Amino acid sequence: MKTIKRISVLVLVSLITNFTWAQTTTDNRSLYEAFEMSVSDGLNLQATAKVGIRPVYGLFSVGTQFVAENYKWAFGAGVGTHLIRNENHSMNLEYMIFHVNENEIWTDNYNNFQQIRLLYSKRIGEKLSIFGGPSLNLNIAENKQSYGHTFESTFDPYSFYSHVGNNHTAKGWIGFTLGIRFDKK
């Protein structure tokens, strides 16, 4: 648990530093800004804003899992990098961490969704690209008695990895993401 909190703080600090540096730089050619809409098995509909410099950028995202039985939504942040980037193609590696809310506007219990995505994109217009790729997903949720009830997350669509501990449940799965991206060349 302490390791996850440390990683979360590290990601947030790097995002803030990256965003601040990207806004103060005088060379706007290195500034990267994008907005994308995507669908996946974890968050069925997701909107993401990206800002940073060309090699590294920050991500801010909100999404929902509307095909599930219960109401679920999440918000999060992350960091990404361009592994390959040219005029018509790019390959990005991204790490996202979300707080998941289930069956209510705000879930007080620790309910964390982490995602690593490898995305290939193809430019189809001057400011429009389509993208897709595999993702590794992990949902870690508090399963102990707290806030007057016992919480058990139902966020994962399926799992190939599952671990139940004294305080937390972890479920992992491999997924896929498809979407459209609005950005400049």
Describe every region a protein language model picked out.
Residues 5-8, 53, 97:
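Intrinsically disordered, low-complexity segments enriched in glycine/proline and serine/threonine
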Residues 79, 169-185:
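Outer-membrane beta-barrel "beta-signal"
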Residues 31, 101-103, 157-164:
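Extracytoplasmic loops and strand-loop junctions of Gram-negative outer membrane beta-barrel proteins
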Residues 61-149, 169-171:
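Outer-membrane beta-barrel translocator/channel fold
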Residues 1-28, 184-185:
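Cleavable N-terminal export/targeting peptides
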Residues 10-17, 57, 68, 83-85:
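N-terminal non-cleavable signal-anchor helices
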Residues 22-70, 181-185:
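Short glycine/proline- and aromatic-enriched beta-strand/turn motifs that initiate or cap beta-hairpins
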Residues 146-160:
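Solvent-exposed loop segments that connect transmembrane elements
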